[in-house]
């Protein structure tokens, strides 16, 4: 989808992303012309192990020590450091916002300044799966909890037009798991 937009001359004035959309958005904001191509080569190479290392049962054992999450976000942090050249929002080519959710207020939080890595980790911190991220005195979780499609934020930033990308294949749905190990996978 991103490559098709690029090929048709659609270039964003700003990018706002939530969760995996924040990761994709950061790639595009860092490199508006090459980011889509880079993503098209990276995503197909990922497996469950890329971001969720270890067995399902090892993850359950993690709960005995962490109490709040199954997987540390170390692999994701390493991925961000390795593949996204910018360290801060200010280094990006296109204005970018990563959406997160404030644990205390349960409201969406627009992250658009300072450290990019912590913002991306916060925006992708799926509760129970990854740890929350502390940033600017707030504890933050995945932005998809309250702003999966951050249209309000785009309108607040005076976006004249919006392009929303739904990355789910039409009519395609994973089967429901039929065991605890299936849930953990």
Feature-to-residue mapping (PLM):
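PAPS-dependent sulfation machinery
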Residues: 83
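Active-site gating loop/helix substructures
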Residues: 86-184
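Patatin-like phospholipase
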Residues: 1-80, 112-122, 166-177
């Amino acid at each position: 989808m991103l490559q098709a937009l690029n090929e048709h001359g659609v270039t964003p004035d700003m990018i706002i992303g939530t969760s995996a959309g924040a990761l994709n958005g950061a790639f595009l904001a860092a490199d508006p012309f090459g980011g889509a191509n880079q993503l098209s080569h990276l995503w197909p190479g990922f497996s469950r192990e890329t971001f969720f290392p270890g067995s399902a049962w090892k993850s359950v054992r993690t709960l005995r020590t962490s109490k709040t999450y199954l997987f540390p976000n170390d692999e994701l942090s390493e991925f961000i450091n390795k593949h996204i050249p910018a360290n801060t929002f200010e280094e990006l080519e296109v204005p970018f916002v990563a959406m997160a959710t404030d644990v205390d207020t349960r409201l969406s939080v627009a992250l658009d300044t300072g450290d990019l890595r912590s913002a991306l980790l916060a925006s992708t911190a799926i509760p129970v799966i990854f740890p929350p991220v502390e940033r600017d005195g707030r504890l933050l979780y995945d932005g998809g909890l309250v702003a999966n499609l951050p249209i309000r934020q785009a309108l607040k930033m005076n976006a004249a037009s919006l392009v929303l990308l739904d990355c789910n294949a039409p009519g395609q749905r994973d089967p429901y798991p039929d065991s605890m190990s299936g849930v953990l996978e």
